[in-house]
Design a protein with these regions (language model features):
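Surface-exposed loop/edge segments in extracytoplasmic proteins
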Residues: 12-18, 50-53
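Short aromatic-glycine-(Arg/Gly/Cys) micro-motifs in beta-strand/loop hairpins
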Residues: 1-15, 45
C-alpha cells in the first residue's frame, strides 16, 4: 500500500510520488530539495490524513496565525487527496520513486 505521498511543485503544477513508508517519503522529500526546478511541499499520510511540511514551509507554517494554519493545512491536504484520487480514477500513470530518480540522470 502506498500510504504516503510526497507533494511537490514542478513547472507550476502540483505532483506527487507514492511511498510505502514514512522513511522512504522523507528520503524522497530530501532528494527533491536538491533537484533544480522541484519545489517540495511536504508529505501526506493517507491513513491519518495528516500533512508534514518540508522544513522551510514548516517554519513558515509555525509562524502563521491559527486561522491561517488551518486554511493552508486544509489546502495542502485537499491537493494531496485530489492528486491521489486523480491517479486512482484514471488510467494515468502514477509517479514512482524510480521516475523521480531518473528525471535528472
Amino acid at each position: 500500500m502506498n500510504r504516503f505521498s510526497v507533494i511537490y511543485l514542478l513547472n507550476r503544477q502540483y505532483h506527487h510520488i507514492y511511498c510505502a513508508t514514512q522513511t522512504e517519503a522523507y528520503a524522497i522529500l530530501e532528494h527533491g530539495l536538491t533537484q533544480p526546478g522541484y519545489k517540495p511541499i511536504g508529505i501526506y499520510d493517507a491513513k491519518t490524513e495528516l500533512f508534514y511540511w518540508e522544513p522551510t514551509r514548516q517554519h513558515q507554517y509555525n509562524r502563521a496565525s491559527i486561522e491561517r494554519q488551518g486554511k493552508i493545512a486544509s489546502q495542502a491536504i485537499q491537493v494531496a487527496q485530489n492528486l491521489r484520487h486523480r491517479d486512482e480514477a484514471g488510467p494515468g500513470q502514477a509517479n514512482s520513486i524510480a521516475q523521480l530518480l531518473q528525471i535528472n540522470n
